[in-house]
Amino acid sequence: MADISPRMQEYYDRLNAGLAQAMEVAKTARKTGLDPETVVEIPIANDLADRVEAQVGIPGVAQMIRELEAVMSREEASLHIGDYFAEKKFGETTKEEILDHAIRTAMALLTEGVVSAPIEGIAKVAVKKNDDGSEYLAIYYAGPIRSAGGTAQALSVLVGDYVRRILGMSRYMPREEEIERYIEEIRQYNSIMSLQYLPSEREIRLIISNCPVCIDGEPTEKEEVSGHRNLERVETNTVRGGMALVIAEGLALKAPKVLKNVRKMKMDGWDWLEEMIQATAGSSSSEEKEVGIHPKDKFLRDLIGGRPVFSYPMREGGFRLVYGRSRNTGLAAAGLNPATLHILGDFLAVGTQMKIERPGKAAGISPVDSIQGPTVRLINGDVVRIHDAKRARELSSQVSHIIDVGEILISYGEFMENNHVLVPSAYCESWWRLEGGTTRPADEDEAILQCESGLYLHPDYLYLWDDLKPAEIRSLAEFIHKHGTLADKTLILPLDPTIKEYLERVLCEHQVREGMIRITPCRIVLKCLGLDSSLALSDSWEKELPESALDLVQFLSGMKMRSKAGTRIGGRMGRPGKSKPREMKPAPHVLFPVGEAGGSRRSVQEASKFSYQANTEGGNLQLEMGVRRCPACGTESYKNRCSCGTHTEPVLSCSRCGIEVQGPVCPQCGMEPTSVRQYTVNVRQMLQQAFADLGMRDRDVELVKGVKGLVSRNKPVELIEKGVIRAANKLFVFKDGTVRFDIIDMPLTHFRPREIGVSVERLRELGYLQDIYGVPLQNPDQVLELPPQDILVPEGCGDYLFSCTRFIDTLLEKVYGLPPFYNLETRSDLVGHLVIGLAPHTSAGVLARIIGFSKANVGYGHPFFHAAKRRNCFHGDTLIEIYADGILEEIPIRRFVLEHLDLSQAGVDALGTFYADPVRPAHVRSVDTGGIPHLRKITSVSVHKAPANLIQFSTSRGKNLLVTPDHAMLVWDVSYLRKIRALEVKIGDAVPVWESGVVISDRIVSIDYVPCEDERVYCLTVDRDHNVVGNGIFTGQCDGDEDCVMLLLDGLINFSRSFLPVTRGGSMDAPLVLTSRIDPTEIDKESHNLDVCATYPIEVYETALRYGNAKDVESLVDRVERRLNTPAQIEGFFFTHDTSDISAGPLETMYTQLQSMLDKLDCELSLAKRIRAVDEHDVAERVLKTHFIRDLQGNLSAFSKQKFRCTKCNTSYRRMPLAGKCKCGGNIIPTVHEGSVKKYLQMSRQICEEYNITEYTRQRIEVIDMNIESTFGEEKVEQMGLADFM
């Protein structure tokens, strides 16, 4: 990491000191032997070099990388790695080994080694023979190389060329038929998968003829080539997707980047790249490209009930784009004026996600009051611009029409990140100041004077003239000339509907009194319309007039103006996430089994009274727990500490051979041993002893909840005392032994002390000594820069963590015999304490410090803090078998998830992670722990931000699977299946696969690693067995929870890998490693596009006017990427737009306040009627087509195929038993009810009556209505008597 300033060094020293202090306490507590292990089980993460070494598994690589990076760039180092391997410094024996290690290590370095994955997508490397007998290098790429990105794909070829030169190997000399095969195969692959860039035949021929390395690949598609088959040096006739991707999206598309590295390394033999670049540039320049953008309605395609649309794509009255970043935006977060949030029905609260038209797909919403708010028409006809939240709340009930929803603040970095052209911005004060403006005019007279001095008209006094046609502007001017009067600087006009509409469209504020329109002030309006003080038309109207509206008003007024409309951005509401305690279902207090004795609540108290036989003392239970042995006295029990005071150790035995095993596998059969036994445990006595040891009485805690059974590998147990203390503090334990709170993340780079509920004095104690301008910190309104690992948590999270500190202190004092650590009296005392932040589907926690609290229900953190966390699942191309509506179909998981993402139930955070119930019932093939296949229901689908790298598994039967590093994989263990993390899978592991209609065992033969540049990864949650067939391999699912925080000491003391489940979730979402210091160079590259300047250069706005590429001005904008490897990479950030309060606006979305879907839909359509930029009829139609009809059809189908379950023991039946009761005597009930099938039927009918719905959609509703009636019969009409009306 680069050098840092003394201030930041002190900051990291504070963090490290706090971590060391907590670590010492945790180590001391663990030494007591009361936990499964006597050491802290969360290690501290190391640097990139160490991670690469761990990934490739070659000792000594880390030191080599550090030496190289000290004297050269990363790209150069990735090539020079080959020098070390060629010298066989790491034990290589063959050319294949040298080439393989060098290429994989180089790619691991190029992709920064984040999340433990080196070179995914390379199947193997081989040394082959040319026709002249010389040797050449062939690199076999697999289909998932797509996720590596074009640059990494191309550079892997360059690395291969560099190393083969060192080894004295010849270049690849292709045969003519091989070149023709490449041309045919790449074209065919494009027709199957659609390449990002399809090179021409000439380009393909040029690449293959000149590339010194043979780009080969494994078959990835079902289709075979029709010509050029059975070639001697091409091992398959099947289409090789990996090869096509590397040539098309790597070498062809990224040729300029490859050439740049070639020149830097002074490598010969690549001059042909220049020829290809020139040919491509020439062909593109000769084509006339259309300048501009078009409306994109993709964000509207999955519209559902209850989620309002705020603006249609590029529609008048929609969000007007303003470039800039506030201290609480950036990194997929956009800014809206708090007044806009209130006027839009309070549906957009702080942190609510909004699906947007451009530049990306979604953005978390933050309040920014330095941009303009909405313009509305009140019930009395007045038109008012509203720019502050207080006035918006006062007027919200009087609004009849929302003419303009206001401005939206999106940073330049978002356009860079999404590779989107810059589009014209609405004229704003930042732009005005770049063009010479200095002081905001106090009134319109001063604004006119500024224009007379040569400045552009200030944006506060601009009207949206470009929303009118020149003919309409003329009509407006002539009407005022004929019918208007002036009185005390007020223009008075008769109330004419057409004229009022014109005034509304240009956002001209006015009042309606006694049938007259009153405009005050009006001088600029009159000048723009070519009217003098007597309302006479100026001579300019008689001259030749410009054709555009904006040019016309400039011509008439003599003032320079820019467009106030700019580019309109469409948007609609996504689902807000919830910040809440993390709870399992059902939520336990302690990881201690109570079996069926605990009842449905898993009550330890109830279990302590349970007896298997009448008239016997209760509490003696038969429980399955891990076998442990005391090394001192040899006693065997389930306890972590023996009665003699010595820590016990697991006793491993082979269930097949019946022998005790010392190592990780049985020496006789090679299977992994287990450590499980049935024990008779007196739970009553244990509970009483726990209360006594804690100095508590039974009535102090009403309910302590355990678990039905342990699901970890060796089944160790937690102390019941921990559960009692948690229950007393109303806390719940997660699967790994920790207490967590889920929060929705929002970015923040600066804050004011008054916003976070912390005194100036306390902040100075934490190291905040001066504001961003270097002024000593003295008052709560100064702006302070947030360091990368300081966070704000919601107030509710603060309360929960405060309770957790009381749990930890009691635990230390009463159980471990140590002094309390926290000793807090109030929630505010949490400030300055350390926590662990963890994103779902990851295994790496990030150290953070709480420095305050957010009134909004979100967690604010530095963009680096959020970017340092990862999300993991399946690659989008993974094929899964879906059974829906009686049809079994194999489709990519990406397609299924996107088609079934029900946004009425979808969760989302600021980083764009979605998870939801599927829009209609569907099932997938799953396998239970015994290897028996079943069709299981999909209970949710999810879309996640992709991690930096992915892992590819290949089996001996030719199956391949691409997953994220923390994904759960199924492996055979003797006679049952267990789950392990993808990172823990080894070559030779037996995995279950689906082939020819049966589950069989297959072996992992290769594990490859690839950097991932895809935007998203995908997953789904499967009922009961929680696994699915992906590409023919049974594999686990992912969970879909929000990011979470836990107290540092809670994690260090109570987390144990031994508690992690084998069958559900596994080791995912567990802090297996702790990153103590964030290195900006090693985190998600999205954060590198964060702009950190105080103002944009004028070139940004000028480039946007001509729809130029964002990269055209990247060298002019101060972004994190330009600061990497300097002290400025973590401090000295600025922002272009300030905001007065990061928690302004609604704190809870109206969506969560409304209880029924009927109320939500009514509000959605009511709001659509009021917003000018929304077509309410189209909204109603879309809701029917994409939500209600799908739901009605799906539920009706599910009703006919439903199962039945017992209310007592939860046993499931395919059909109702003849006896009408369960074997246990419990009642049998259906799982799909009539009410759930009909729930949207009446609403759908009502929509068809009230809105202009197409005849086709109406008839679909009628058909569904008839189907439902034929299934359930006509609704009963209740006969009412006369008394019912009295």
Swiss-Prot record:
It holds the Pfam family PolC_DP2_cat. One of its GO terms (molecular function) is single-stranded DNA 3'-5' DNA exonuclease activity. It catalyses: DNA(n) + a 2'-deoxyribonucleoside 5'-triphosphate = DNA(n+1) + diphosphate; Exonucleolytic cleavage in the 3'- to 5'-direction to yield nucleoside 5'-phosphates. Residues 566-586 are annotated as: Disordered. Its EC number is 2.7.7.7, 3.1.11.1. The keyword Transferase applies. GO terms for biological process: DNA catabolic process; DNA-templated DNA replication; intein-mediated protein splicing. This protein undergoes a protein self splicing that involves a post-translational excision of the intervening region (intein) followed by peptide ligation. The keyword Secreted does not apply. Coiled coil: none annotated. Keywords: Autocatalytic cleavage, DNA replication, DNA-binding, DNA-directed DNA polymerase, Exonuclease, Hydrolase, Multifunctional enzyme, Nuclease, Nucleotidyltransferase, Protein splicing, Transferase. InterPro entries: Hint_dom_C (IPR003586), Hint_dom_N (IPR003587), Hint_dom_sf (IPR036844), Intein_C (IPR030934), Intein_N (IPR006141), PolC_DP2 (IPR004475), PolC_DP2_cat_dom (IPR056172), PolC_DP2_central_dom (IPR056171). Possesses two activities: a DNA synthesis (polymerase) and an exonucleolytic activity that degrades single-stranded DNA in the 3'- to 5'-direction. Has a template-primer preference which is characteristic of a replicative DNA polymerase. Heterodimer of a large subunit and a small subunit. Belongs to the archaeal DNA polymerase II family. PANTHER family: DNA POLYMERASE II LARGE SUBUNIT. This is DNA polymerase II large subunit. It comes from Methanospirillum hungatei JF-1 (strain ATCC 27890 / DSM 864 / NBRC 100397 / JF-1).
